[in-house]
């Protein structure tokens, strides 16, 4: 049985919320950044990230699923040819929400939601180097503990051999 999503529903009915999120996602992919209320930005973030993940896969099935939500073919084309490949090596976190203060008319909290830039080759190399350094440090700690244990056992063996020679 379908259950409503958690949190307050935007715009009243479920159908209105669905259309509102589709239009916000359409504007986000068209312009790269949009200014909206914090509540709408928080609801839009997982919705838009799911669409970008479908665009990263790039197959016909995912394209048709996105076309059910975003009916503008030119924006879907942009999503699949430019935005999806841009985040090919990023495992998530394609959007950023920045709070910008309250709206003048009704004092509603506002935010900017934008598509983050793709990781550059240098950033990817830096991330891989940091991961390798952490792995090396972890391996060094593990091997140091093993070598200390070996040293302790060899000392015990030497002492046992010395005692046996005294007894004999």
UniProtKB/Swiss-Prot annotation:
Pfam families per record: Ribosomal_L17
Keyword Ribonucleoprotein: yes
Family matches, as PROSITE patterns: RIBOSOMAL_L17 (PS01167)
GO biological process: translation
Keyword Ribosomal protein carried by entry: yes
TM helices/strands, residue ranges: none
GO cellular component, as recorded: cytosolic large ribosomal subunit
InterPro entries: Ribosomal_bL17, Ribosomal_bL17_CS, Ribosomal_bL17_sf
One function term, GO molecular function aspect: structural constituent of ribosome
Matches recorded under PANTHER family: LARGE RIBOSOMAL SUBUNIT PROTEIN BL17M, RIBOSOMAL PROTEIN L17
Family: Belongs to the bacterial ribosomal protein bL17 family.
NCBIfam families: L17
Name of the protein this chain belongs to: Large ribosomal subunit protein bL17
Organism: Streptomyces coelicolor (strain ATCC BAA-471 / A3(2) / M145)
